[in-house]
Amino acid sequence: MVVSPWDAMNFILYSDVNDRSISQSLGRPEYSYYFVLKAYRPVLESLGQVHVVASAAEVDPLYRQLQLAGQDSLFLSFAPPHKTPTDLQCPVVCVIAWEYDSIPVAPREEDAHHDWSRILARHGRAITLSSHTAQAIRRTMGEDFPVLVLPTPLWEGFAAVRQQYPAAPVNPGAVLQINGCIIDSRALGLSADGLIAPTPNEQAVEACEPVDIAAPSEPVPPPPELTLRRRAFITKHYLREGWRATAASNEHPRLFLLKHNLLLWYREAVRDLLPVALRRQLFRLRTPAPEPLPPTVSVEAPTVAEHPQACLPDTSATLQTEVSGVVYVSVFNPEDGRKNWHHLITAFCWAMRDVEDATLVLKMTQNDLATYYVHLITLLSQLSPFACRVVVMHGYLEDEEFARLYGAASFYVNASRCEGLCLPLMEFMSCGRPVIAPDHTAMHDYIDERVGFIVKSSREPTIWPDDVRILYRTLRHRPDWGSLKKAYEDSYAMAKSDPVAYQAMALAANERMREYCSFAPVQQRLAQFFQLTPSASPELIAEAGTASC
């Protein structure tokens, strides 16, 4: 038990995701609110008694029980206003993460449950995670509407990570572990030729086609010739892939991988140098002659074979991988259209195309691998060959495993179109990691040139996420791909050639988070907003972690 210097107040907390469901809730819209509640809880425990309820239906019975005991209560709903009850007896305050420049309003009565202005007016006040959200609320509710801007107080929580994993521009080697699966670009044998798996019917038709092809009616311009430099680069790439196939253990036989890489090298680098007659002979050696078809007597329509489905990796194993060099990390839900993850990957692969010691680690907060696996493999295949490395981690990370990820990072990367706060960005900055990120929406509160490399962006119209009318009534931001690519290049150059500047930026990132989201200033602002004053006879409250749930 600890002594609280403030008047007694009971805080009733609720989030749709809790400790029991968090590992199964990756990718849900309410996923981030769980971490906001978890970060707020120690501050609230320092101001009064905390009660975490499993459902909103438990709020009023608990409120009446505490009221009979002569104690004040306040319900903090870690959810958007339209998912917060409006018929409770207990006073309610919404804790809101919102990334657009205006809040949903409903001119039609049938959409009233999505009208935030009515709900917030009923509550009378609100807590937001950023100045951007507070401005959006005041544009609708008026400048005098009580809104507290309160970022999550998480800086102190990363003291152990800062001590155990000091910032380093070039990682000498770190082991990452996850219970799920790891997709490594260097173990995939990537090639654009392997994007489409032929069906049995397509294979039969291809085998029966004659070798001689009739000349088209109009001349087709020949493809541009490959330069010697390009041929050498392709040769180097497949030599490296062949060496990896023999040196590392793999689910495929080594001979199969060697033949696969040899075939791809032949197609991309030397096939056009061989005479046509020789190419035909090689094709016949590789493709057996088709057997004669039996006479058909049936006139039934042939069945169309379906394309084979993608074989997904096993997601139940505990796997490890080692990363080294300049390591970029990003954490996001690939199903969230705001995250702009395609640009995050393409800009990296183009910026580091010839760089072998640059690695991009993507931690996916999504339970269903099938929702993005094909898109990811297609994108990486289209970008190949590239010398850099992309590692995708799918699954749930425990705290110790996440600490390894924090420690492995040289930079954290964000390329979002809009953010309500971006907890992962703040967490990596609290670990003393410089960043690559835009400075729009919530990130404008804590991102500038002293803590990272700014990605330029411009505004574009968009819709509110739950708008049933699908009208363009708000704005988000469009990150500039060229600016993101240049940020990768500039950050890599700093890490390799200017470690002093890197350490200065890392120190600035850590200091920014200490000023922005450390415990004491957040506690003071929260006490002032709720008009709590130091108590003459302070009461006992539960220690962090022992509050009733």
Task: Please provide the spans of the model-predicted regions.
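Conserved donor-binding/catalytic core segment of Leloir-type glycosyltransferases
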Residues: 170-224, 230-235, 318-339, 345-348
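Nucleotide-activated donor-binding/catalytic signature segment of Leloir-type glycosyltransferases, i.e.
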Residues: 370-403
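Aromatic "clamp/platform" in nucleotide-sugar-dependent glycosyltransferases that forms part
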Residues: 417
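Short alpha-helical donor nucleotide-sugar binding micro-motif in glycosyltransferases
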Residues: 403-409
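Extended catalytic core of nucleotide-activated donor transferases of GT-like folds
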Residues: 48-138
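N-terminal pre-catalytic "stem/leader" segment of glycosyltransferase-like enzymes
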Residues: 1-79, 85-88, 334, 359, ...
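A charged, aromatic-enriched C-terminal amphipathic alpha-helix characteristic of glycosyltransferases
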Residues: 475-486, 493-528
